[in-house]
């Protein structure tokens, strides 16, 4: 269905431009009508996009399926080369000690 509102507003604008002598009134009316047209078309486009995305949401998403299939378990540590240094720091520095009364060794102290 063709929306006849823009055609109607164009006819109204041309009629106003022909009949009205004052430019400020004409420009005010033209700006109000064009603002209304812009807002109306943006609302219509957004409404159409929302309907489209709602229909897409009902279908299966192949990207989600492939992502969940390829996802690695959380037990994988990407910084395994750092594990010995972390173990040494756990034994050496104060944040690895369970005894709150032991002397903390500050990092960077010489």
Swiss-Prot record:
Record-annotated membrane-spanning stretches: 10-32
Location in the cell: Virion membrane
Domain of life: Viruses
Transmembrane keyword on record: yes
Keyword Transmembrane helix: yes
Protein family according to the UniProt entry: Belongs to the asfivirus H108R family.
Name of the protein in question: Inner membrane protein H108R
Organism for this UniProt entry: African swine fever virus (isolate Pig/Kenya/KEN-50/1950)
Organism classification: Viruses, Varidnaviria, Bamfordvirae, Nucleocytoviricota, Pokkesviricetes
């Amino acid at each position: 269905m063709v929306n006849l509102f823009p055609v109607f507003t164009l006819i109204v604008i041309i009629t106003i431009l022909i009949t009205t002598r004052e430019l400020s009134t004409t420009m005010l009316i033209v700006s109000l009508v064009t603002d209304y047209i812009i807002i109306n078309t943006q609302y219509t486009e957004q409404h159409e996009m929302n309907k489209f995305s709602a229909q897409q949401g009902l279908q299966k998403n192949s990207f989600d399926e492939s992502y969940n299939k390829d996802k690695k378990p959380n037990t994988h540590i990407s910084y395994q080369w750092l594990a010995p240094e972390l173990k040494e720091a756990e034994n050496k520095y104060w944040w690895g000690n369970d005894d709150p009364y032991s002397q903390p060794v500050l990092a960077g102290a010489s």
